[in-house]
Every structure is written in C-alpha cells, then in structure tokens.
Amino acid sequence: MTDLTSLTLAEARDGLARKSFTALELTEAHLTAIEAARGLNAFVLETPEQARKMAQAADAQIATGDGGPLAGIPLGIKDLFATKDTRTTACSKILGDFHPPYESTVTTQLWRDGAVMVGKLNNDEFAMGSSNETSCFGPVVNPWRRAGSETKLVPGGSSGGSAAAVAAGLCLGATATDTGGSIRQPAAFTGTVGIKPTYGRCSRWGIVAFASSLDQAGPIARTVRDSAILLRSMAGHDPKDTTSVDRPVPNYETAIGASVKGMKIGIPKEYRLEGMPPEIERLWTQGAEWLKASGAELVEVSLPHTKYALPAYYIVAPAEASSNLARYDGVRYGARVNGRNIVEMYENTRAAGFGAEVKRRIMIGTYVLSAGYYDAYYLRAQKVRTLIKRDFEQCFDQGVSAILTPATPSAAFGIGEKGGADPVEMYLNDIFTVTVNMAGLPGIAVPAGADGQGLPLGLQLIGRPFDEETLFSLGEVIEQAAGRFTPKKWWA
C-alpha cells in the first residue's frame, strides 16, 4: 500500500472517495508520522483522540455519500486559531493554559466540510517573527537540510510549524496566517505552497490578533491544487468580522490547468535589490520564462514606493499590535503573576508573559502612537501605505494580470543565525512580501527551484483583489515546470 502520508490532499480525497483506504487509516498514518517527527517541534499540541473521533465521523459520512469536500482529510491548525475546549496559546506564556469556549470561523468551516484536526501547530509568539524562533515552545526545525550538513535550519515564520508539518508529511495541509509574509515566506523556505488571500476573504474571527488591518488567514499545502481546495473551505463572509467581504467563494480548483495565454505578467524593477543573491535572480528569470513559454506576456512595471514598504510596515504593524495586546493583563484569562496592587499585577504578568520580540514590538507601537510622534511616524506610514496601494492599482489598470517576484531574499538559514544583535536583519526577510499586506492583495508562494546547497526557493505571484484564481492558474504553471520538492527524511 502507498505511504498515505506521501499523498497530496487531492490524491487522498480521491482515494477516500474510491474507498482505497478509510479516513481512520489515513489519520492513523499521520498520527504515527507526527509521533516520529517530534524532534521537528512542529506541533505544540497533538490531538490523537479527537482526530480519531473526527475520522470515524468522516468515514460514516463517506459511507452514506454525505461526506463534505474535506471529509477525512487530516489538517494541522496554527496555534493562533481558537479551537473550542482545545488549548490555544499563540505560542505565548501569557495565554498559559487557555482553552477557548468558542471555535474560530475558519476552523468551524473546515470541520463543517469534514476535515480532521491532528493537532495545534507551532508559530512565532503572537505571529511576530520570520523564523519561528520566538515561540515559547522553542524553535521549529525545518525538515530540509543543506547538502552534506546537519545544521538545523529555520522553517521561516511566523507559520513555521504549519510549513514544516506539511513539508514533512505530518498533515495534508495546514491553516496559517499572514501579516507581512507569514504564509509565503515559510512556504518558500520549506518547498510548500502558501497563499495569502485578499484581505477580507477569510474571516479573522477567533484568530488571535496581531495587526488587524494586515492579518489574513490562508492555507499551506503541498501543491497549488491542494491550496486551492483548502482556500475554498476557509474563505467566506462572516458577519462576526466587520472586515470580512460578502462575495461568493468560487471553486478555486477549476482554475488549476486553466490557460494563461495572453495574460500580462508584471516584473517590477524595484524588486531587483542591490546584493540580491545570483540564484534568486536566476530563479526569478527562469520563472518568467516558464510563464512566457505558456503564452503569458512579460512586461516591466514600476512600483516606486516599494523601498518604503518595510519601514512603514514596521510602524503600522507594531502600532496595531500594541493596541491588540493591551488586553493581555492577567485579569480575565491566561497566565497571572500577582503583585501588591493591580498595576503591579499588570506589570508582573506582562513582564513574565511576553517574550523579547513581542515586548520590542509593543514598545515600538506604543512609541509611534504616543503624543508628539503620532504624526511623524504612524500617520506618515499610513500615507505611504496609500501610495503603495496606488502603485499596484496603476499597474493593474495597465492590464497587468499578476506580478511575479521572488518570495524571499535567501533560502532557509540556520537556527540562531540571524537577528541576534540586530532585529532589522530578521525583518529584512519580509522585504518581498510586506507590500502585499499593505495593499490588501492576494499573494501566493510556489516552490520553483533550489539553491546551491539543495534548499528550496520560492517565487511569489501577486494578484488583483479577489482574483486568487489567476494566481492558482499561474502558480500551477510554475509548479509543473519546477516539479515537486520533498525533503529527504532524516528525522525519524
């Protein structure tokens, strides 16, 4: 029998429909894989009993022909999504042993469609990080290694657990969130596919907030088709989220294999950074050639405010975070460290509960929102954001269907290698991805090649608002040309 953990989500779905195996068998195979891969630290909570019950329920539905589109599919859930009566911590000590009395909208929709939860996935604390090193549960180890080396690499962040679990065959797909690149960068680092949908496409209700005007949920999966299948279940209007957009959810899977002939693909000159590694440059050129060979037309475009995106992002995101994280005070839920009075209790709780990176961003955010600095920093950053959005609008007004860029400035790096003394070094990982969040656009990262040491590299496609289908069609062209990327198993 085929190793069930090596199947794509689409293959597993078809196999379940044909009754080649049961949902319980599929789930057991993944639970065994999770157990053997604990050294990767991708999961912060395994839920085997719950998974078996959900798989048995899926088998019963499949038997009567009532199975949903994800019936019996084992998924991992980023620990930012509230899961009812199942510990949810955002990988922060401050949430302690929090068991939400409610379920996030996105996970509710996944369970409605028959998916099986195998566990909660590691992430950077409160989704603040680009390497999954800020989690209170410790770093996630990338299933990929450099050729001939045993150095442990980061999987990217903040959705590092999601990307590592999918790459290592521990689940068939995973939920993730993206505030400045937290789906696309880990996908690129692990040879997986990650899509950040248009802002408002997926509900944010029940997801621990980082920066509310930037946060967006999306899937990480092994293939473009798999990510399309997952997004269809995750997306949809939710009256509980005022930023959720009320428009029909298309069947994204129909975009797979659709012709890209005649599509105009923008190549932004501002993304050609000084000191860009030659292998990233080559990959970008190669990706453009693949799209051209499929009938797309390449055009150079200009996004003149790109260079201001990263500094503006690191004002807007911390400002919103400082406001969102004010609610963690030890009073109503989560951890509490007592003091002689209530103010001291707040101080003690927040000092003990938040990690260094979260504290840094709260302080930056509080500073840029403070009297005397608000206009100089926050207001100016919001103006830059408007200009970035306008750059994209002008580009799309010229008939451009999508924009092709690198996903990351490098391949995965070693745990502890970056950002020690200078956090800006770590922040630069988001250089190609933050513009998409600032403009509220959809972006997909697709594995497209490998660096000189055999590590996967990804390309990013940026689309028009609510035109995820075009990204899936173009992404599949790159995927077909580049082939699949699977790490050699060393961890079990």
Swiss-Prot record:
One of its GO terms (biological process) is translation. SUPFAM superfamilies: Amidase signature (AS) enzymes. One of its GO terms (molecular function) is ATP binding. Keywords: ATP-binding, Ligase, Nucleotide-binding, Protein biosynthesis. Signal peptide: none annotated. The keyword Protein biosynthesis applies. GO terms for cellular component: glutamyl-tRNA(Gln) amidotransferase complex. Pfam families: Amidase (PF01425). Its EC number is 6.3.5.7. InterPro entries: Amidase (IPR000120), Amidase_CS (IPR020556), Amidase_dom (IPR023631), AS_sf (IPR036928), GatA (IPR004412). It is an enzyme of class 6 (ligase). The active site is at residues 78, 158, 182. PROSITE patterns: AMIDASES. It catalyses: L-glutamyl-tRNA(Gln) + L-glutamine + ATP + H2O = L-glutaminyl-tRNA(Gln) + L-glutamate + ADP + phosphate + H(+). Belongs to the amidase family. GatA subfamily. Allows the formation of correctly charged Gln-tRNA(Gln) through the transamidation of misacylated Glu-tRNA(Gln) in organisms which lack glutaminyl-tRNA synthetase. The reaction takes place in the presence of glutamine and ATP through an activated gamma-phospho-Glu-tRNA(Gln). Heterotrimer of A, B and C subunits. This is Glutamyl-tRNA(Gln) amidotransferase subunit A. It comes from Rhodopseudomonas palustris (strain BisB5). The lineage of its organism: Bacteria, Pseudomonadati, Pseudomonadota, Alphaproteobacteria, Hyphomicrobiales. The gene is gatA.
